[in-house]
Amino acid sequence: MRINVLFIGNSYTFYNNSWDIFKKICLAEGKKVNVDQVTCGGYTLEQMNDPLNEYGAKVAEKLKNNKYDVVFLQEQSLRPAIGDEALFYDAVRGLTQKIRANGAIPVLYETWGRKEGSADLTKYNLTNESMTQKLIAAYGAIAEELDLFVSHVGTAFYDLNVNNPELEIYDLDASHPSSFGSYLVALIHYATIFDKSPIGVEHTYFTDIYKQSIAEKAAHKAVFGDSILKDEYKTSSEGVTKTVSN
């Protein structure tokens, strides 16, 4: 059976062609997949949910004219961590309704906190840990409300940033993923939608077997291990909205 996958997001989705790495991992593991995407740098899910927006119209067109099995949703990387959770929640609600009408399964692509030294952390009075926790909390809250799957990429990034910083999961901008980080992203997406451990996948992205092994173990832990969300960051999305009732 062939699986049709659509990615909706921004540069965190298309950086280093991580969607293509995902496809190659799937194919190497005997999973037949078609991969499609609607992405634009810096975009929010609010824009992707707006049919009057250029890319929002593309999302609507894709969902109208194609049949998908899985659709990944990736929010602008700061929005859920800087007090704009309601806009994030509303967009996920709207897109989830459209995706389910297509017959597909929505999956949230949980992103990560900026690397230490990022100007954005200073600007918003965040740390790598606090930004990570806020993102995990927001993605988890709307996932619980709408009964969604979450691809816990941010969880794995935090794990490796703390425990294996020498492997450099970040690009030089302290925001986007390095090539190693993009491989990690792809592994987690694969494990999430197929409910299969990524340890020992056939596709060899790195000639460095040690780095590949670390990525596979971190991906497995993020998908199948316990949540790292701390109690003080736990939240609910119920009733949190920017939508004005008539």
Which residues fall in each region the model found?
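Conserved SGNH/GDSL esterase-like catalytic core that processes O-acyl groups on lipids
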Residues: 4-6, 12-89
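Conserved catalytic region of serine esterases and O-acyltransferases that act on ester linkages
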Residues: 169, 176, 186-246
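Mature, Sec-exported extracytoplasmic domains of Gram-positive
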Residues: 2, 41-45, 54, 78, ...
